[in-house]
Amino acid sequence: MLSPQRVAAAASRGADDAMESSKPGPVQVVLVQKDQHSFELDEKALASILLQDHIRDLDVVVVSVAGAFRKGKSFILDFMLRYLYSQKESGHSNWLGDPEEPLTGFSWRGGSDPETTGIQIWSEVFTVEKPGGKKVAVVLMDTQGAFDSQSTVKDCATIFALSTMTSSVQIYNLSQNIQEDDLQQLQLFTEYGRLAMDEIFQKPFQTLMFLVRDWSFPYEYSYGLQGGMAFLDKRLQVKEHQHEEIQNVRNHIHSCFSDVTCFLLPHPGLQVATSPDFDGKLKDIAGEFKEQLQALIPYVLNPSKLMEKEINGSKVTCRGLLEYFKAYIKIYQGEDLPHPKSMLQATAEANNLAAAASAKDIYYNNMEEVCGGEKPYLSPDILEEKHCEFKQLALDHFKKTKKMGGKDFSFRYQQELEEEIKELYENFCKHNGSKNVFSTFRTPAVLFTGIVALYIASGLTGFIGLEVVAQLFNCMVGLLLIALLTWGYIRYSGQYRELGGAIDFGAAYVLEQASSHIGNSTQATVRDAVVGRPSMDKKAQ
C-alpha cells in the first residue's frame, strides 16, 4: 500500500507534467486514502493551477459535477471542455466538433467500476470575458463517484461537501429520476458541508442543478430546462399532508442553495451504453442527446450565465479559492465534525437507545416503589437485594426488545445501561441513607456528646487543680459549640454547604474512630475472659 506521502508525490508529479506539457489534463487535488478513509490536499498541484500570474487575482467560476459512480459525470465534463476550447479558439457555434473525433479530457470509460477518485480539476483555467467586459477564471471540477464498494458514508459526504463548498455551480448527476433517497443523500451531504461553514449567515451554497440522465418520460416532462424545471417544482413541492421528514428534506435544500434548477437529458443511445469500444465519437451518440447537449452546455457556461464563486456575499479569486481549499480540508481531517452515519446505523442506534431508555425506566420506577421520596428508610441489605432484582428485570427487558444492529452492536448499549443503573443505585442509596434518623442527627449527636464529655473533663481537671488543662478543655467546648451552631444554621439556610460537609466529615471520622476503639476493646475483654476461664476452673479444683 502506498503511503500518503508517496501518493501525494505521485499526484504532484502528475500535476507538474500536466502544467509543463503543452497538452492540459486533469490534476488530482484531493487525494483519497481508501484503506484509511482519509483525505489529503495536494497544495502544490492546486497552487500550480490557481496561482498562475494571469488568473490568480481574477474572480473564479467553479463548475463541479458530483453524483453516484459510473453515471457519466466525466463524460459531461468533457463536452464542457469542448465548448470552452471552442469559445477560446474561434467562438464557432458548432462547438460539438467533428463526428469522427473521439472524446478526450477527464478520464472516463464504460463499465461498472469507478474511474475518478477524490477531486480532480482541469489543469487549464479558462479566462472568459463576461458581457460587461469583466474577465473571470473558469475552473472545471470532477469528483469521486459516490457509493462505490470502497467508500464509506463519510468519504462520500466529505467529497460531495468539499465540491459543493468550493463550487459556484454544483451539478448533481442522477440517473433516470430524482428519487427520495437522492434528496435525502443531498440533505446529508450539504448539511455536512454547512457544519464546516459555521460562520455563514446567508444561504451557504450558490447554484444546484439536478442533471437527470436517461430521462424516459418526455411525454410527461419534455427534455431540457423547461421540462426539468416543471418536473423539479413538482418533486420539491412542500404540501401540508406530507410527512414532516419529507417536508424537512425539501425545506433544507431550498435553505442551502440560492438557486436550484433541473435539466432532463435523454439516453445517449445503445452504442454508448453497451459497446466496450465506444470512445466518445459524436456519430455513435443519439441525435436527441446531442441536441440537448447543445442546450445544456451553453446554459451552464455561456459568458452571460457564468456565476462567480461567493462566500458570505464576497466574491472569491483563484488565490482565495486555494486558501479556502486548505481551510476546508483541515476541518475534514480533524475530529471536530460528527461522522455522518448510514441510515441503517442511525436507525440501529435509535432502536438501542430507545430500548435502553425503556429498560432504565423499568428499573427506576420499581426502585421508586421501594425506596422513593415518601417511602420509609430501608435496610441497606434489602435495598441491595431489590437493586439486583430490578437490575436483572431491566436487562432482561433490554435483551428481549427487538433491535437492529445485532448482538455485538447492542452489547455496547447494554454496558452503558448497566453503568446508568449503577449510578441510579448509588443515588437511591444516598437518598435512602438520608432517611435514617440516626444518620440525620449523627453530627449534632457527636458534637453534643463531645461538648458534654469535655465539659465534665474540664470540671474534673479544675477540681484537682489542673487549671491549664481545664482551660484547654473549655476552649474545645467553645469550639464544638460554635461548630454545632454553625451546622444548625447551614442545615436551616442551605448556605455554606462545603463547610457543612466538612463538619459532617469530621463528626463521621470521630464516630468511626470511637466505634473502632470500642469494638477492639470489647473483643479484647471477651478474649481475656475466654482465656482466663480455664485457669480459674483449675484453681477451683
From Swiss-Prot:
Signal peptide: none
Positions of the UniProt region annotated as 3HB (three-helix bundle) domain: 343-434
Name of the featured protein: Atlastin-3
Primary enzyme class: hydrolase
Subunit structure of this chain's protein: Monomeric and homodimeric. The homodimer, transiently formed by two molecules on opposing membranes, is the active form mediating ER membrane fusion. Interacts with ZFYVE27; both proteins are involved in endoplasmic reticulum tubular network organization. Interacts with REEP5; both proteins are involved in endoplasmic reticulum tubular network organization.
UniProt EC number: 3.6.5.-
Molecular-function GO term, any one: GTPase activity
Source organism (scientific name): Homo sapiens
Keyword hit for Magnesium: yes
Sites where the protein binds GDP: 70-75, 109, 213-214, 272, 275
GO biological process per UniProt: endoplasmic reticulum membrane fusion; endoplasmic reticulum organization; endoplasmic reticulum tubular network membrane organization; protein homooligomerization
Topology in membrane: Multi-pass membrane protein
Domain notes: The GB1/RHD3-type G domain mediates GTP-binding and hydrolysis as well as homodimerization.
Recorded consequence of changing residue 109 to A: Decreased GTPase activity
Family: Belongs to the TRAFAC class dynamin-like GTPase superfamily. GB1/RHD3 GTPase family. GB1 subfamily.
